[in-house]
Amino acid sequence: MKSWAAKYKDAGLVVIGAHTPEFSFEHEPMNVETAVRSLKVTFPVALDSDYRIWRSFDNQAWPAQYLVDAKGRIRYHHLGESDYGEIERVIQELLKENGATGLASDTTGVSAVGIEAAPDWTDALSPETYIGYRQALNFASPERVHKDSIQVFTAPAKPSLNHWGLRESWNVNAESALLQTVPGKIVFRFHSRDLHLVLAPAKEAKPVRFVVRLDGAAPGENCGSGQ
């Protein structure tokens, strides 16, 4: 999106983002502003906390792209993280319809890194996994989760693929698990090029200190960006 916004700005393309939160922490404007700055997003981003934009487009998934022509008509929409070449070709066609000239026929090749890198779907055998009890699946610690209560868990010794567990004292609520005593541990057996974990401090402006082990050792060159 950033590349398209820069490449086609002078040809008349206007990019507007809409952030529709999935979790409660995503409703906070400060969190969204921090993410926008961190990702160096320069086009405007609307915070759609009440899902008005989502519902008006009858949207069904994150992310989604909608291309609107100069007359305000939706001419193309796409769900998911793929087919970027096709989307860009439609952008070019709509700009030409509106009188743009001199557009290159090639599409943008972006070699993004870190959290912006395109997913490797050919080797991604692990789905999005939720820690909160509302959507959690494949919990492998032997203890049964008591909702919204502090309890001590035992980490699974050899979890199956896409199974996970906790160790030490946690309070598992609908959307997250809150560590009660330090240290604690999350164990997850996954198969994917990338693993992203959402962490947040109990108090604002406090850093979250954590250690990542991959197959019991430091990840070394496989260490991610930490953003």
Which role fits each region the language model picked out?
Residues 37-42, 47-92:
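Thiol/disulfide oxidoreductase modules built on the thioredoxin-like
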Residues 85-227:
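Non-globular targeting/processing and membrane-anchoring segments
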Residues 4, 19, 54, 62, ...:
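Tryptophan-centered motif/residue detector
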Residues 31-32, 59, 77, 111-118:
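Short amphipathic alpha-helical patches
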Residues 1-38, 47-53, 208-210:
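Structural microenvironment flanking redox-active thiols in thiol-disulfide oxidoreductases
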Residues 12-13, 43, 80, 99:
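Secondary-structure boundary/capping signal
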